[in-house]
Structure formats: C-alpha cells, structure tokens
Swiss-Prot record:
PANTHER family: SOLUTE CARRIER FAMILY 22 MEMBER (PTHR24064)
The keyword Transferase is annotated on this UniProt entry: no
Function as written in the Swiss-Prot or TrEMBL entry: Probably transports organic cations.
Alphabetical UniProt keywords: Glycoprotein, Ion transport, Membrane, Transmembrane, Transmembrane helix, Transport
UniProt keyword annotation of Ion transport present: yes
Listed GO CC annotations: membrane
Name assigned to this protein: Solute carrier family 22 member 15
Transmembrane segments: 22-42, 97-117, 136-156, 161-181, 191-211, 216-236, 297-317, 327-347, 356-376, 391-411, 424-444, 450-470
Family membership: Belongs to the major facilitator (TC 2.A.1) superfamily. Organic cation transporter (TC 2.A.1.19) family.
Pfam families given in the database record: Sugar_tr
Membrane topology: Multi-pass membrane protein
Length: 534
C-alpha cells in the first residue's frame, strides 16, 4: 500500500489534521507575516524637521502629530515630531542615510534566500519536524535580539538571521503539513496559510497602532512565536518523508498515530517499499540532470521571482499613498483576502485548474500594472472615476497575491516526494532574489514615473505566458519518485483524464507515447546518471 492509500484509511483530514492545519497554516503564518513585514512600521519615518530652520529634509515644513522627539548627540539638529519611535528616529536614518531602511529590508530577504535553499536540503536529509522546530526556536531568539540590539549594524545582522530562519522554517512547515494530509486537501491548506498571512499583516498593523515604541513592539510580537513553538514540539514527523527514506516501520507508526488521534479504528496495513532513487542523495544535480524536472524548475524559478518582485514592490509602493501608516498597512493586507476564495474556486475547477489559474492571475495582475501608465491620476467623475492608479495597483496586488498562493500549491504537486522540498527550495530561492530587488524598484520612478509599473507589468505577463508550458496537476496523483514523472497517470490530464487514473495499468499503456518499458528504462538510466554525478 502506498502512503496516499494509507492516509485514506487513517483519515486524509481528520480531527488531528485540522489541529495541525490550525497550528501550521494559521498560527504560524500569523507570526511569519509579522516578521516578514515588521520593517514597514519599525522602519517608518516619523515627521521631523531641522532645528536650524524647522524644515524637513525635502524643504517642506514638518507636520506635528504628537509630542516632539528631539534627536541627541551628533544628530542634535534633527527633531522628530511623530508620536511613535522607529529605527529611523533611533539611528537618525534620514537625509543621506535614508537608504539604509531599504537595506534592512533587502538584508532580511537575503536571509530568506539562504534559508529556503539550505533548509530544503536539511529537511530532506534530517527530517521535516526537527529542522522546522529548530528553525522556529532560533527565529524567536534572533527576533528578541533584534528588538534589543543597541547599534544599527547588529540590527542588520539579526534581521538577516531572522530572515534565514523565517524563510527556511516556513517552507519546511508548509511541506510538513501537506505531507500529513491527503493530497485532495493540499490546495485548501495552502490557501488557508496564504489567507492567514494576509490577516497577519492586518493584525500587526493593529498591534502597532497601540504599541508606538518600536523596541517594545518588536519584542512582544515574539510571544506568538514562542506559543507556536511550544505547541509544535509534539507534532509527528512526515509519514511521506519517512516512507521516501525507506523507514517503513516508522512511517507506518506515524500513520497509525494519525489514525488514533483522528479516532479511526485502523486495521494493520503494510506500506510498499519505494525505489531509493534519490531519497538519500538528492541535490541540485538530481533536478537539472532530469529533463522533465529541469524544464519545470526553470519556468517555476522565473514565476516565483516575479511573484515576489511584484508583490513586495507593490506593497512598498503603497507607502506613497500618504495618510495613516497603520491604516495603509492594514488595508494592504485586507486587500488580499478576496483573492483566496476566488483562488480556491478556480484551482479546483476542472476547466481552469492550477495552470490556468496561475497564468490568468499573473497576466491580469501584470496587465493592471501596465495600464497604470495610461491613467496616472484620477480620471474624473462618473463610473470611470474608480479607474485610477490606486485602484489598478490594488487590482495588481490582489492578483499577484492569488498567484503567490497558487505557486506554492502548484510547485508541491510538480515535484516527486524524493526532491519536493529541494525543488521548492530552489524555486523559492529565486522568489527571495525578487524580494531583495523589490525595495529598490520603486526608485525607478525618478527616471520615469511609470517605469516601476512597466517592470512589474512586463514581468507578470511574461511569467503568466511561460506557466502555460507546465502540465496540469489537478486530479493527478502525487509523484513519489523520479520514475513516476514518466508514468501515464502523471502526464497532463485530458478532460477524461480523471477516469483514466482508475483504469488498470495495462489499459493505461494505450494512452502513452511509445513503449512503457522503454520509458521506464530511460528513467532508470537517468536515475543512475544522477547517482553517478553525486
């Protein structure tokens, strides 16, 4: 019996898996979102003026929002007038030093870049649970250090380390949850996590509204992380990972444990051993020496890069709207919420599926960004008054949020279990490169006001078109090994493809191109080449 069949016996989404979903897709994502966007408040610039002429850095008079916070020391000529503190007022990151706020954001995503690729390989080797728990514990520690750091260089270092842990453990937690539930619930779990990430942005804005000291704010948000860590100590290891590693007894015990916690009366069963094609030695060569994985990976790397670039680029650009920073941040998160129910409906619709939804959201989001250059301001009164740069930017944010949600789910289904975490880590690595670059894209407006949106739009449309070259995974069984990639059930499904999945293996041979024995031998040769390269 395969793992998927065993999960049907013990429960694909029972009581305990609902608890795991609440822990890893709700509570954890609320905390992860906080650490990911915390710099939007910690790095906010309070209104200020120069004591010599009461003028702000750009030559306009500063606004009074609350008690004055005069600067001290060598920066004593600066007076901050806001009713909140930030790293800007702490270390005087104004004027020529203002760029250092963007650097702190890029440093974080640089850490995430390291985390997603290194944690992927670590969890494939040492297990999902120990790598996830260790990463979460270290993130809480480094985040507390970040709140207490006395100097800006140490602040940058701890932000980098928080990024490493946040990016790495979030990816592993996502895979761990998916490998503990039935494949038919992967989309729901992924959408729930993305939904809670958006809620986490609004939650952080609410907390920041009441806590105006950046140090106290950065410290208290880790209470949630510590609570999630305590609850994570008792979760099981992934049965799919144990099975892929050839640890059949432990995999069976893990599945039986899920059954008991789901209150299922499960009879004994025996898992079939799997080919040890790359379970113990998978690395980047395993992916790029396989033609199918290589094509999928190259396309998905660009898609992940674009999703991150446009998502964070539009988020940072929303800061130019003016008004209350807490309200703007909350709306930025809440604006994503409509994307997820729509996304859930479309990715499970047989006429759209994963591939069609991803391509559609990317193209619509990119098209909205391109339209901004045609309507830079308000278009007047009447129905067309809603067609302005702010509305189109919000539409782009909504669509790219949906695409970001789909790309996690879709990537999980494109890779076999033996390299799933590694493959997602490689793709997610390029997403973080997009995050590193994103803080600097809005600065292109100094060359031409529409240039940032042209970049976002062109990137989104190109990624959407390229994603059409990928296979559809809706209703297809999850591949476990490299050999499964060439099996008929894993090929692109036709309208009646779902029915084909239940036909005997002998009948499936009629739907393949060429001899199935030749395909299997070719795949085994590829596996041997991978092992030889390692």
């Amino acid at each position: 019996m395969e793992v998927e069949g065993a999960l049907k016996l013990v429960g694909e989404m029972g009581i305990y898996q609902i608890y795991l979903s609440f822990l890893l897709a709700v509570l954890l994502q609320l905390y992860s979102a906080t650490e990911a966007i915390i710099i939007t408040i910690l790095g906010a610039t309070p209104p200020y003026h120069w004591m010599n002429d009461s003028l702000t850095a750009n030559g306009s008079r500063g606004k009074q929002y609350g008690s004055q916070l005069p600067a001290e020391g060598e920066h004593g000529h600066v007076v901050f007038d806001g009713n909140f503190t930030s790293i800007v007022s702490e270390w005087f990151l104004v004027g020529g030093a203002a760029y250092e706020v963007s650097v702190s954001s890029s440093v974080y995503f640089g850490g995430v870049l390291i985390g997603v690729i290194s944690f992927g390989q670590l969890s494939d080797r040492f297990g999902r649970k120990p790598v996830y728990v260790t990463g979460l514990a270290l993130e809480v520690v480094f985040a507390v250090m970040n709140a207490l750091t006395p100097i800006f260089p140490l602040f940058l270092l701890t932000r980098f380390l928080v990024g490493v842990m946040n990016g790495g453990m979030s990816l592993v937690a996502f895979v761990l949850l998916n490998e503990c539930i039935g494949a038919s619930y992967w989309a729901a779990a992924g959408s729930l996590g993305s939904l809670c990430f958006a809620v986490g942005i609004a939650q952080f804005a609410l907390i920041g509204y009441f806590i105006r000291s950046w140090r106290l704010l950065a410290l208290l948000v880790n209470v949630q992380g510590a609570a999630v860590l305590a609850l994570s100590l008792c979760i099981p290891e992934s049965p799919r990972w144990l099975h892929a590693q050839g640890r059949l007894r432990e995999a069976q015990e893990s599945l039986l444990s899920l059954g008991r916690r789901n209150r299922r009366k499960v009879t004994s069963f025996t898992l079939c051993p799997r080919q040890k094609d790359s379970a113990h030695s998978a690395n980047i060569l395993t992916i790029y020496s396989n033609a199918i994985l290589r094509q999928r990976t190259l396309i998905m790397m660009w898609v992940w890069f674009v999703c991150s670039l446009v998502y964070y680029g539009l988020t940072l650009s929303s800061g130019d709207l003016g008004g209350d920073i807490y309200l703007n941040l909350a709306l930025s998160g809440l604006a994503e919420l409509p994307a997820y129910p729509l996304c859930m409906y479309l990715i499970n619709h047989k006429r759209v599926g994963r591939r069609g939804s991803l391509a559609g959201f990317l193209c619509v989001g990119g098209g909205a960004c391109l339209l901004i250059m045609l309507v830079p301001g308000k278009t007047g009164s009447g129905p067309l008054s809603v067609l302005n740069s702010q509305t189109l930017s919000l539409l782009g944010k909504l669509n790219i949020s949906a695409a970001f949600n789909i790309v996690y789910i879709y990537s999980s289904e494109l890779y076999p279990t033996c390299v799933r975490n590694l493959g997602m880590g490689v793709c997610s690595m390029f997403s973080r490169i997009g995050g590193i670059i994103a803080p600097f894209i809005p600065a292109l407006r100094f060359a031409h006001w529409a240039l940032p949106f042209i970049v976002f739009g062109a990137a989104g449309v190109s990624a959407g078109l390229l994603s059409l070259l990928l296979p559809e995974t809706l209703s297809a069984p999850l591949p476990e090994t490299l050999a499964d990639l060439r099996g008929a059930p894993y090929r692109r499904l036709e309208p009646d493809g779902e029915a084909m999945l239940h036909r005997p293996q002998a009948e499936l041979g009629a739907f393949t191109n060429g001899s199935s024995e030749e395909d299997e031998e070719e795949e085994l040769d590829a596996v041997r080449e991978c092992q030889a390269l390692i």
